[in-house]
Amino acid sequence: MKQRLLVMNGQKIVQHEQEGLWLNDKVEKAGLVKPGIYNLYLASQADKTKTLDGVILHADKDSVFQQVGKNVVKHDRADFVKAPAIGSHSSVTYDQGKAFARAAPEKLVRGMSR
């Protein structure tokens, strides 16, 4: 089943595709998730040998979805001792098959300001 996350106007809408139409499954507050369309069905399975830094987009009973760069990664919900907060910028690591999420360190960015 194709599933996507639509974030706009402060709302987070979980949709699934049925016969070419997108139907709403759940509508809730977006919180800290940035506006956009996130195709959850295109998510790749998380590499358990790497540390993955990014924003937690969505969590359901089976999976936790995280945006890493421009890609979406899917973690198994059962691997987490405690599921991370939606919208939080988290660093997910695996140790002995269990996933641990902690707040990712802020990256310093050099920019111009006036």
Language-model segments: what does each one mean?
Residues L57, K61-V72:
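Acidic, low-complexity, intrinsically disordered interaction modules
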Residues V27-D60, H89-Y94:
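Structural detector for short beta-strands of small beta-barrel domains
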Residues V68-I86:
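Beta-strand/loop nucleic-acid-binding surfaces
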Residues F65-Q66, A104-R114:
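Non-Sec secretion/translocation targeting segments of pathogen effectors
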Residues L5-L42:
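A general sequence property marking short-to-moderate contiguous segments
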Residues R4, N9, P84-P105:
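Flexible glycine-rich surface loops and low-complexity tracts that mediate binding to linear polymers
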